Amino acid sequence: MFHSLSVKNFILIDELEIEFTNGLCVITGETGAGKSILLDAILFCLGYKTSSAGIIKHGKDYAAVNIVFSLNDEIKNFLTQNFIELEESLLIKCVQKAEGRKNFFINNQVVNKAIMQQLATYLFELHGQNNNISLLEINTQRDILDSFGDLLELRMQLAKCYQAWQNIRNEIAEIALKQNSIEQEIDYLNFVTEELIKLNVQTGEEEQLTNIRKDLQNKDKDLQLIKDIFEQVNNPEINSSISKAEKLLAKQSQNEEFANISTNLEEAYNNLEEARQNLSNLLENFNKLDYNLEEIEERLFAIKAISRKYNVSADALKTFLEESLNRLNSLKGKIANQAELQVQEAKLSTEYYKLGKDLSGKRLAAAKRLEEVLHHELKQLKMEKATFHVNIAERKEAAAYGIDDIVFKASTNPGMSPEAINKIASGGELSRFMLALKTSLFNKMVKPAIIFDEIDVGIGGEVADKVGERLKKLSSATQVIVITHQPQVAGKADLHIKIEKTQLEKETKVTVKALNLAERQQELARMISGKAITEASLKAAKELLCHPVA
């Protein structure tokens, strides 16, 4: 519900703040007093077109409107989905600068006009001389009938079935449309996956092989060095020279010094043999290496080539293979499951039309009940000559909401054939049609507030009293705000707001005030007799306040 409305520098208003209550709130004032300004302020704040062109009060550089609204689960979900922080209440604000720029805020966060207008659909309905757009929309008429007939749950079940059916149909159509391209992609993916599986590149393999290649290149240098050394120490002349020297020394074996030299030569020979053996072992170990530089080079070349071919890094080739296999299996599955999808499509189609016919039959029954209830309500509103008919025709194509096209038709004069309600009813009549519908549905109200703008134009007396009764009844289910000229309606209010226009020397001002009981009696008396308030009008006003509901 609306908690409060704050307005500053708006049209003829300097500054005001109104606190609303639950129930029935009426707004009254003399003709031309500016009762529509409050409605314009609400529309302005929520991003809708207003009836007034000049929004900013003359001499001011900006206009601002603030609305505080209570929260419900739907509003909370909307705010959460749009990343708007939740507060204890819903705070809505719009500021327009003199240069024309307009800024919208929800809970002090800047939002665009589209978000603000979407939010408005969760807050209230507006019905008046030029604002019965919702009643004229086919979607709204369908919602009214289904809500009245308690058919929303069945319709939701139908919508889920329809969505599943359409998903299957779209999948079948996609396969049929892309049969050739799917088969071509399967051929391509078969080639890709076979090539990748054959090469079997592992994550980190390129780096590992690069390091091994570097080691092998260094070992090649070591191998050449060992071969050169081995060639030198394995020279037969070295052994021959040592042998000759030892034979010469043997002739002088009695000489201790020569004996020591002979020992040294023997040790040199042994050390040389050991060096030869060590070098031979090194050469043998090199020949036993697991890695071959030429093979490593070939493997690295193959990895780099396939990486370039598919524009994928070497480490990502394994993931690329997995993705390609998944895509390949998915496409093969689509082809293989085409027959199965067609079976599912037929099953869902049968289920949809079964639910659709069930919903259609229940809509026909609900339509008859709604027509009866509405005719009763229209009689209460002194529209005895009006007729109302819910036209239900079978659709040519299935839809999420069913197999029916639903149009509200009416006639307001005898002898007239019923036509679409927007073609035959005036603004006031549309408002009373909507009031009759809302009264019929008052236990199923979903919007926190309803605003009626001059719903009682062109009526009076008993009709106005009946309109007031219906508004009062409706206000027991949701907050109702009414701009009215009728004392019979105003007398039933839980909150009575009066708007006055004052002509000063240099400007015109509009003031807004919530009336107490005595002030309400004076205002009702004025509404009854005009500016010249009489004892009779005061008495009648008191009677209306004492007996607000007949």
From Swiss-Prot:
Family the entry assigns: Belongs to the RecN family.
Name assigned to this protein: DNA repair protein RecN
GO biological process: DNA recombination; DNA repair; SOS response
Domain of life: Bacteria
Any one Gene Ontology cellular component term annotated for this protein: bacterial nucleoid
Keyword Nucleotide-binding attached: yes
Binding locations of ATP: G29, E30, T31, G32, A33, G34, K35, S36
Gene coding for it: recN
GO molecular function, one term: ATP binding
Organism the protein comes from: Rickettsia bellii (strain RML369-C)
Functional summary from the UniProt entry: May be involved in recombinational repair of damaged DNA.
Pfam families from the UniProt entry: SMC_N (PF02463)
Keywords assigned by UniProt, alphabetized: ATP-binding, DNA damage, DNA repair, Nucleotide-binding
